[in-house]
Amino acid sequence: MGLIVDDDNDGEVLIPPPNFSMVEDEIYRSGFPELENFGFLSTLNLRSIIYLCPEPYPEDNLKSLASNNIKLFQFGIEGKTDPPTPMPKDTVLSALRVLVDVRNHPILIHCKRGKHRTGCLVGCLRKVQNWCLSSVLEEYQKCAGLKWRQRDLRFIEDFDVLRLKQCLYSIIYQYNGYGLKRRKLLYQEENVVQEQQKPQATKG
């Protein structure tokens, strides 16, 4: 079930979602949160959740998100399939764009168990952060446990982070070193300088 935390303020027992952990400051990952986990999640002051499954989000969970002003971003990626299907690169890229936008932080990433789909997205984030590939793959395997998938490792290895830079039309996320604490968000409009057209005088 995960670690049980006692809230010193009112004695409430707080239960994290399965496989919960911190990725970076204000970025978290986990398995699918149940209603019993939302007390714990409220302590994170989340702004957003990235949900990586195709199934509709439970109505009770949606109500809890609404009451806490948490935005839900759903990217429907199939889990275990027979035969196995490749991870959709464009979908992961879209999720990554949401993830690197600090306006969505604090943010939680989750799929069903918080291992494979979540692990692939976090692995791609690490590549954006310029982690060495061996460390990226090691983190994926550690979080996936005995059920790590070779095809996920190949996906992370082959994922082209240059595509992210090409697709960030209005936001450039600039990393200084490996950490996110010294991050800097630069807002850039597609047309940085837009001259206002003034009415032209007409000759009578």
Curated annotation (Swiss-Prot):
It holds the Pfam family Y_phosphatase2. InterPro entries: PFA-DSPs, Prot-tyrosine_phosphatase-like, Siw14-like, Tyr_Pase_AS, TYR_PHOSPHATASE_DUAL_dom. Highly expressed in flowers. Expressed at low levels in roots, leaves, stems and siliques. Its EC number is 3.6.1.52. Keywords: Hydrolase. The keyword Hydrolase applies. Residues 19-168 form the Tyrosine-protein phosphatase domain. It is an enzyme of class 3 (hydrolase). Cleaves the beta-phosphate at the 5-position of soluble inositol pyrophosphates. Has highest activity on 5-diphosphoinositol 1,2,3,4,6-pentakisphosphate (5-InsP(7)). Possesses low phosphotyrosine phosphatase activity in vitro. Dephosphorylates the phosphoinositides PI(3,5)P2. Hydrolyzes O-methylfluorescein phosphate in vitro. This is Inositol diphosphatase DSP5.
